[in-house]
Amino acid sequence: MSGLEGLMRGRVVLVTGAAAGVGRGVAAAFGAAGAVVGLGVRRPEAAAETAGDVERAGGTAVVLRCDVTDAEQSAAAIEQLVAEHGRLDAVVHNAVSGRSNEATDFEHTDLGEWEDHASVTIRATWRLATQSYPHLRATSGAYLLMSSPAGIEGSERAPFYSAVKAAQRGFVRALAREWGPDGIRVNSVAPLAISPALENLAVTEPERVARITALVPLGRLGDPETDIGPPSVFLCSDEARYVTGQTLVVSGGRFTGL
């Protein structure tokens, strides 16, 4: 990813849900751009491979215990990153409910599932924004949410996931207006990419994954590091200094009317 080289050099970024999938790929891309990358994970040992990716790409990895449903943990992760590296330039909230890996018909959903999705996606989106705001204001930084096409057009057997991702999109639009005068940009990326959820689906319903892939004009699902990472880095860099309040759909052409 030579095009990213130096794009975030001297910058400090927090990526939540960085242990696997899109989060791992995005973290590696920020490493390739020269950033210090805080890897927010529930279990620090789970971030070992991601940390290696970041370091090999040319960045600096900082593993942080950061369960985004725990207010004290997320606050401590942000403060540790700032204390050790002096600043915070971007937050990428990528963490999702572990139950997003499950395809569930609406009639089989329950309140516990809803609360889990809401806690990780909606409440944590607000909480991370609140906790990072003074640091992002100091650096004229960026707040990036990892949304989903499901939050725009809906997804069968994922009603709660679709709902919370739609809420994130509205949050982006509102917060971009409010934080703009402070120099903070707020955007989201809606990727169609290889993820733990799709990997699980490939085992349980391979024909469904084949149908999804067949609908992508570019003929494949996105790679988290090389397809989703660069647009995410761009939106957090000075190259996107006049872009805010937007959702960038990165889907290989699958979703062209969103």
Regions found by a protein language model. Name each.
Residues 2-4, 103, 153, 232-233, ...:
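Short C-terminal tail/terminal secondary-structure segment
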Residues 12, 19-21:
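Conserved glycine-rich cofactor-binding loop
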Residues 35-49:
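Conserved glycine-rich Rossmann-like NAD(P)H-binding loop of the short-chain dehydrogenase/reductase
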Residues 44, 65-77, 111, 226:
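The beta1-alpha1 cofactor-binding region of Rossmann-like NAD(H)/NADP(H)-dependent oxidoreductases
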Residues 97-98, 111, 142-167, 172-181, ...:
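Catalytic loop of short-chain dehydrogenase/reductase
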Residues 102-106, 110-118, 212:
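Substrate-binding pocket helix/loop in short-chain dehydrogenase/reductase
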Residues 181, 188, 207-243, 250-252:
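C-terminal helical subdomain
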